[in-house]
Regions:
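N-terminal structured subdomain of primase-like DNA metabolism proteins
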Residues: 1-99
Length: 99
């Protein structure tokens, strides 16, 4: 197989280490974090929530709403869903793309 020099060259590289720390990010999104232990609670921004049904892990950024079922593994997934963005747009908005 020959090397194809016409292949698209990527101008941006995703760097997970540049993502904001989960606790800071979630607070900047207006979430009031409560509770102790590994999982914190907050009202869910993905549906009309009066009780804190969203669970958040501050070490990994993982999240899950016990009421509406929305979930993801990190702040990037949260940002994508909250702002209806694709991966590249969300990574760029969070400063995790090296261009």
């Amino acid at each position: 197989m020959k090397f194809n020099s016409n292949r698209r060259k990527y101008k941006s590289i995703f760097n997970r280490n540049l993502l904001p720390r989960p606790g800071e990010y979630y607070r900047k999104q207006g979430l009031k974090l409560t509770g102790g232990g590994e999982w914190k609670s907050a009202t869910c921004p993905f549906h009309e929530d009066k009780n804190p049904s969203l669970r958040l892990r501050l070490d990994s950024g993982g999240f899950r709403c016990m009421a509406c079922g929305v979930h993801g593994g990190d702040v990037l997934a949260f940002h994508m869903q909250l702002h209806n963005l694709n991966f590249i747009s969300a990574a760029r908005a969070l400063g995790a793309l090296e261009e």
